């Protein structure tokens, strides 16, 4: 007699009963927490002698939560079926308190201000990031399924620091790793249909802005931040087309400004600026025309560390566009003397001939045989034409950036770079 089916069915029914029980208990607990929060809010307002207004007007708020996600939020999200897969007990849809992580909360009129028990302590925030990197990301090295989850939860970490105005060394260390997470994501997820790279770049710039403010505070207090040069370099390269980035660098203390990684970042910044202006007044060919070519060589050089290269990769389409335009201006096209496509691919760090063809086609520049038709003209006018939409990266670059990536993402996020690039002596 086969008893497998009845046994399996009984186990399924038990699981359903447990889930119904948990839901009932969860709703009861949630209602208790709602009532407790109302009392707690009134108590805090009374203690602060604030009869009208907000808690933020009463006093600086200090978080007391030692869980990665406050209990109230966890119970509320459970009732709304808003628990993410990395937060669930395996094989269930129930929130695991040891895995659930507080979400980012947008500021909006009508939203309640957080209570102290809604805000995590600095140690808890650091432990939360440890969990995100060493557990969640470690289980998904390609970041495909976990990226959106981690991006939201790291925003929440930064938000808790900001609300409490915590600006200590823990904040610095946490923000540094969050910045590295965004840089790694820009490379690994490039071309993924569900990845909006501009959103990660926005969050990276926000994080770097916070770090620069924190570094300034620590420097005024004569506290040394060991990774300051590394993250100033990232700030410079994340603002390649912004002249203000150079002015920020020029105001740095000498030992930071002269650090090899900062100098390498400034070199990339200078080359990207120079690459944007086509030069029509020389006949010396592409080598003297456009520093965009040198930009890719600099990214590939051993002196450019991994994450700096990942960040520079974000600008590859615009640098290539400028280089292509400059070469079209410099070369008078002659049929049968097209520019070798393999040389073109190497020069602008393309991974394949197909990638070259796809890129050039966006600008109305064609290929003939094994060559690129640089400088082709119709009725005396160059055929180069900018597309309606700016070209985007379609896959991670392997030729120069991928060649540097010899470690799992979690190590790139956690580890400092090679000390010879960060030296400030």
List each model region and its residues.
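Non-catalytic protein-protein interaction scaffold segments in large eukaryotic complex-forming proteins
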Residues: 177, 186, 193-200
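Alpha-helical scaffold segments of alpha-solenoid architecture
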Residues: 197-359, 363-369
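Conserved small-residue packing positions in alpha-helical repeats and bundles
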Residues: 177-179, 184-186, 234-241
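N-terminal alpha-helical interaction modules that lie
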Residues: 1-168, 178, 184-187
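Short interface patches used for recognition in eukaryotic signaling and trafficking proteins
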Residues: 135-142, 163-164, 191-197, 305-310, ...
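Short coil/turn linking the two alpha-helices of tandem helical-hairpin repeats
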Residues: 140, 184-193, 219, 241-244
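Structured, charged N-terminal subsegments at the starts of enzyme catalytic cores
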Residues: 170-173
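Acidic, serine/threonine-rich low-complexity intrinsically disordered linkers/hinges in large eukaryotic
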Residues: 376-425
């Amino acid at each position: 007699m086969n008893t497998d089916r009845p046994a399996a069915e009984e186990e399924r029914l038990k699981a359903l009963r447990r889930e119904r029980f948990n839901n009932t208990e969860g709703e009861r607990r949630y209602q208790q927490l709602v009532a407790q929060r109302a009392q707690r809010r009134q108590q805090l307002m009374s203690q602060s002698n604030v009869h009208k207004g907000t808690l933020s007007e009463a006093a600086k708020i200090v978080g007391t939560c030692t869980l990665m996600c406050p209990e109230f939020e966890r119970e509320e999200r459970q009732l709304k079926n808003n628990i993410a897969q990395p937060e669930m007990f395996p094989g269930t849809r129930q929130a695991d308190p040891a895995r659930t992580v507080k979400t980012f909360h947008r500021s909006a009129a009508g939203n309640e201000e957080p209570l102290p028990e809604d805000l995590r302590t600095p140690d808890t925030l650091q432990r939360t990031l440890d969990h995100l990197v060493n557990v969640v990301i470690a289980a998904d090295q390609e970041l495909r399924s976990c990226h959106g989850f981690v991006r939201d939860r790291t925003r929440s970490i930064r938000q808790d620091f900001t609300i409490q105005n915590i600006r200590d060394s823990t904040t610095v260390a946490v923000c540094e790793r969050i910045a590295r997470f965004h840089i790694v994501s820009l490379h690994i997820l490039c071309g993924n249909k569900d990845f909006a790279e501009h959103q990660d770049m926005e969050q990276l710039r926000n994080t770097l802005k916070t770090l620069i403010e924190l570094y300034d505070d620590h420097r005024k207090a004569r506290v040394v931040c060991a990774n300051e040069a590394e993250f100033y370099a990232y700030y410079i390269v994340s603002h390649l087309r912004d002249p203000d980035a150079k002015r920020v660098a020029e105001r740095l203390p000498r030992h930071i400004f002269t650090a090899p990684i900062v100098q390498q970042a400034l070199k990339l910044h200078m080359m990207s600026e120079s690459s944007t202006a086509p030069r029509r007044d020389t006949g010396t060919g592409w080598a003297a025309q456009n520093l965009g070519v040198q930009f890719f060589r600099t990214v590939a050089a051993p002196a450019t560390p991994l994450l700096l290269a990942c960040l520079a990769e974000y600008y590859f389409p615009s640098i290539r566009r400028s280089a292509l335009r400059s070469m079209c201006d410099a070369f008078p096209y002659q049929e049968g003397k097209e520019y070798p496509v393999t040389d073109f691919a190497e020069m602008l760090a393309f991974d394949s001939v197909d990638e070259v063809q796809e890129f050039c086609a966006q600008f109305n520049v064609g290929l003939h045989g094994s060559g690129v038709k640089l400088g082709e003209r119709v009725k005396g006018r160059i055929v180069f034409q900018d597309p309606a939409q700016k070209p985007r990266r379609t896959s991670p670059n392997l030729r120069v950036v991928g060649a540097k990536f010899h470690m799992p993402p979690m190590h790139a996020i956690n580890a400092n770079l090679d000390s010879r690039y960060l030296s400030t002596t």
